[in-house]
Design a protein with these regions (language model features):
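Cell-envelope/extracellular polymer assembly enzymes that use nucleotide-activated donors
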Residues: 7-9, 38, 176
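Short, acidic, metal-binding catalytic loop of nucleotide-sugar glycosyltransferases
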Residues: 26-36
Length: 275
């Protein structure tokens, strides 16, 4: 069976993301056209008319699962229960994909060359203010080089799904899932890219970074003995680097305060453009 005819499911959890879906769902429809793929949108305690947005997208024909209670792990589990194919992708609701993406990513899974695949992530700083734009440039360069950037759009074959197992209720679900797969069975496809938007304000950046810090600490606490974080050397314009490092420092006390008040997983609104 060729990669273009491999059946697969694309699970997209979303909570009140109608604005983002108006941009990303048509792109997903185009990327799925002519493939063996099916989109499964799990609407997670959604009240903003997202289902209507999805049903109005020409050619998408999604399976829509609506959940009354929030929780990303439960949303992902609902998507897994609705899936019927051995090859499965997980796509963030604000990520833009292009035609040919899924065929390229399905190939190593179908051929048994990998159990977990990911596309390279391209970061758009369009619409960001000057300082957040500087931070976004450094972040984008990091994501373009990191060997552990299994996020935004990931794909699993049958063995990968078994090795990963059911989703836990953790903040850093992407990192947890990646760590369940042996490094030799992971593959980032350097010539396949997806696009995401960088946070547009300094406050958004601090919120995003604080959530990442909480997620990393939670994994170390719940799963001791896991692999150490991968460090990718910083590079870029000195002013860009200064802005990036300032945001990192500012996020540390914010993350501690959030932990003190019991903050858990939440939708990252900073990268969900509304216009």
């Amino acid at each position: 069976m060729s990669a273009s005819t491999v059946p697969f499911d694309v699970v997209v959890p979303a909570r009140n993301e109608a604005a983002a879906l108006r941009r990303t769902a048509p792109a997903l429809a185009a990327a799925l056209c002519g493939t063996g793929g099916r989109a499964i949108y799990v609407l997670n305690a959604t009240t903003d008319g997202s289902a209507g947005v999805l049903r109005a997208v020409p050619g998408l024909e999604p399976l829509i699962v609506e959940r009354a209670s929030p929780g990303k792990a439960r949303a992902l589990a609902s998507g897994d229960r609705a899936a019927r194919s051995g090859v499965r992708f997980y796509l963030d609701a604000d990520v833009r994909v292009a035609p040919g993406t899924f065929e390229a990513m399905a190939a190593p899974l179908a051929q048994g060359r990998a159990d977990l695949v990911a596309a390279r992530i391209r970061v758009s700083v369009d619409g960001a203010r000057p300082v957040p734009r500087r931070v976004g440039r450094i972040w984008g360069d990091q994501l373009a080089r990191r060997p552990d950037a299994f996020m935004a759009l990931t794909g699993y074959g049958p063995d990968g799904l078994r090795a990963r197992g059911p989703w836990p209720g953790v903040i850093a679900d992407d990192d947890w899932a990646r760590n369940r797969i042996a490094p030799s069975r992971r593959l980032i496809l350097e010539d396949v890219t997806v696009e995401i938007d960088a946070p547009r304000t300094v406050a958004d950046w601090i919120a995003v970074r604080a959530r990442w810090l909480r997620g990393s600490r939670e994994l170390r606490r719940l799963f001791p003995g896991g692999p150490p974080p991968v460090r990718t050397a910083l590079r870029g314009d000195p002013l860009d680097l200064a802005a990036y490092l300032a945001v990192r420092l500012a996020a540390v006390p914010v993350s501690r305060l959030q932990e003190a008040f019991g903050a858990g997983w939440s939708v990252d609104r900073s990268t969900r453009r509304t216009g």
